[in-house]
């Protein structure tokens, strides 16, 4: 195991435009960090640079205190789990898991011991004699993980390993990856576009956007205190409601552009540096708009209501803005019904319209 450090890491393919812009992060020994973001944000490129599959244009990558910028992937003491499993179809599960060690010249007895140990961790013992075509998608992914485990690397790298699995299997594999990390405590970097994977697996999340690390923090902090409107809209399902408007001079009301006036008394309170009498983007998550006793209330004309099982999601509009409100299962307003919604001051977020950055 080893710490992983990225200092001012930048990437350019043509020497003119950068696809990664000065990534700085220190990942502790044994920490599980998730790179999350939409397609084209640079997360997979950054992972490939850590692995040695892409060159570093500027900056420094160090594993265990050793700078690895110029080292080949095989010399970095890393193991990678891919989206597409990359199993040899003519080999058994045991042969697939041990092949990397075999081509490195590791003794057969040690290979067998490591394969058996990994198979026990991943519950693959009864499958060791099978070939990939005889396995389910989840089993194949466990074999791919086992192949990485037998390497006993300093760092695990996961490149969207669950993307090919159905929803039920993704949940199962998330739990298995959590258990695996709890048992091995190996430094891990995991790439995904799925925010649920990011929130459930990570000790820290790096939210990527257009080649920048938009926010780095614990999942709960990223969710509760998004640094920018991008993070607020990307993390959370459904996304945070973001409303453009103007805070009144006394700070007690928020006038939505082409929409209603909302009561927000106390939201711009002491220490939040939210100036009244100017334009802001007001953010509030759907689950915080459920009517509660004592909360400031507004009204929303319901356009539709989605039944999600444990709860419901009501939709409407304030001016040009689509608004979603999460409701308990027993509340299912009909189309056209007027719904009272809460705007609790402690759950209101203000963002600068010019920069998109969080205030206070």
UniProtKB/Swiss-Prot annotation:
Function: Part of the ABC transporter complex UgpBAEC involved in sn-glycerol-3-phosphate (G3P) import. Responsible for energy coupling to the transport system.
Alphabetical list of InterPro entries matching this protein: AAA+_ATPase, ABC_transporter-like_ATP-bd, ABC_transporter-like_CS, ABC_transpr_MalK-like, ABC_transpr_MalK/UgpC-like, Mo/tungstate-bd_C_term_dom, NA-bd_OB-fold, OB_MalK-like
GO BP term, example: glycerophosphodiester transmembrane transport
Record's protein name: sn-glycerol-3-phosphate import ATP-binding protein UgpC
Binding locations of ATP: 37-44
Reactions mediated catalytically: sn-glycerol 3-phosphate(out) + ATP + H2O = sn-glycerol 3-phosphate(in) + ADP + phosphate + H(+)
Taxonomic lineage from the root: Bacteria, Pseudomonadati, Pseudomonadota, Betaproteobacteria, Burkholderiales
Keywords, in A-Z order: ATP-binding, Cell inner membrane, Cell membrane, Membrane, Nucleotide-binding, Sugar transport, Translocase, Transport
NCBIfam families referenced in this protein's UniProt entry, alphabetically: PRK11650.1 (NF008653)
SMART domains xref list: AAA
Membrane-topology annotation of the record: Peripheral membrane protein
Domain of life: Bacteria
First-tier enzyme category under EC: translocase
């Amino acid at each position: 195991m080893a710490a992983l450090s990225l200092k001012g890491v930048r990437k350019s393919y043509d020497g003119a435009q950068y696809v990664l812009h000065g990534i700085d992060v220190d990942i502790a020994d044994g920490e599980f960090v998730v790179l999350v973001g939409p397609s084209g944000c640079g997360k997979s490129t950054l992972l490939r640079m850590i692995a040695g599959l892409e060159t570093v244009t500027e900056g420094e990558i160090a594993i265990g205190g050793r700078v690895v910028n110029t080292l080949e992937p095989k010399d970095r003491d890393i193991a990678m789990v891919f989206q597409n499993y990359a199993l040899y179809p003519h080999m058994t599960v045991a042969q697939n898991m041990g092949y990397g060690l075999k081509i490195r010249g590791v003794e057969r007895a040690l290979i067998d011991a490591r394969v058996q140990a990994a198979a026990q961790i991943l519950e693959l013992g009864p499958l060791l004699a099978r070939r990939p075509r005889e396995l389910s998608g989840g089993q194949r992914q466990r074999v791919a993980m086992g192949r990485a485990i037998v390497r006993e690397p300093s760092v695990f790298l996961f490149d969207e390993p669950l993307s090919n699995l159905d929803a039920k299997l993704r949940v199962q594999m998330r739990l298995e990856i959590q258990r695996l990390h709890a048992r091995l405590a190996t430094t891990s970097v995991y790439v995904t576009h799925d925010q649920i994977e990011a929130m459930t697996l990570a000790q820290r999340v790096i939210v990527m956007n257009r080649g920048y690390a938009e926010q780095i923090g614990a999942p709960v902090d990223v969710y509760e205190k998004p640094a920018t409107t991008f993070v607020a809209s990307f993390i959370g399902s459904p996304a945070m409601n973001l409303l453009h408007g103007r805070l009144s001079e006394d700070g007690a009301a928020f006038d939505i552009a082409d929409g209603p006036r909302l009561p927000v008394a106390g939201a711009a309170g002491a220490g939040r540096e939210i100036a009244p009498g100017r334009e802001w983007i007001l953010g509030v998550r759907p689950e915080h708009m459920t009517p509660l006793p004592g909360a400031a209330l507004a009204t929303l004309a319901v356009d539709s209501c989605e039944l999600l099982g444990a709860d419901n999601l009501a939709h409407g509009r304030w001016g040009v803005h689509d608004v979603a409100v999460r409701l308990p299962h027993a509340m299912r307003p009909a189309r056209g019904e007027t719904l009272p919604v809460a705007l609790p001051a402690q759950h209101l977020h203000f963002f600068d319209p010019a920069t998109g950055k969080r205030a206070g």
